[in-house]
Amino acid sequence: PKTDLATRIYAVDGVQLGSFYRENRADVRYADLPPSLVQALICTEDVRFRDHTGVDFRGLARAIAYLGKKGGGSTVTQQLAKQLFTERYDRTGFFERAVLQKPKEWIIATRLERQYTKDEIIALYLNRYDFLNQAVGIRSAAQVYFGKSVAGLDLHESAMLVGMLKNSALYNPLRRPELVLERRGTVISQMVKYGVVPASAQDSLNALPLGLSYQRVSHDEGPAPHFRERLRAEVKGLLDAKDG
């Protein structure tokens, strides 16, 4: 799938001078994702991810039985399908979403499963998700919220970011830290439930603060701003001339 990645500018010695973007996104490979992040995602969002072919009919039946109150039944692959191709029905009710949107997601999710490996689907999903505050994709989210690379995320940090996947506007750590802590606890609880985290570690993990190290991202930040702006203008001129 096509993605809009940030354009990064490097000096001759390899130091990054800055970047330009519509969305502050830079992809990471599955191999660079810490195990705790992948485990948190699967335990919380799609525990049968490795077994289904895009649609989890057991989860869907549960969602219908409880009118969506115990999860919407969407797999990670369906959520990726929604990100990539389908319209959003944010103002419609549960049954309207089930009738109008779910069939599209099923078809696209099944096709994605045929075209990509499970690991690739996880990476695609995390690379595209909007974590707000100029953090599009997991790499930007790790940098913006914790000042870290993705590989350097600790378990409780991974759990916070996975918790945001349910609704990043609601679980915005800069606006609702108490609610985000509660949601992080839910993610950790799921990891304990499925044997990824020992029960003996749950209380100590929940006691940790969010530990945010918010890094505001802007086009204007970084060395040589005038040079970067001149370079941007020159490159834009070359591309416009080529298109013309």
Where would I find each of the regions flagged by the language model?
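Peptidoglycan glycan-strand catalytic modules in the bacterial/periplasmic cell-wall system
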Residues: D4-A6, Y10-P198, A241-D243
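Non-catalytic structural connector segments
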Residues: P198-G244
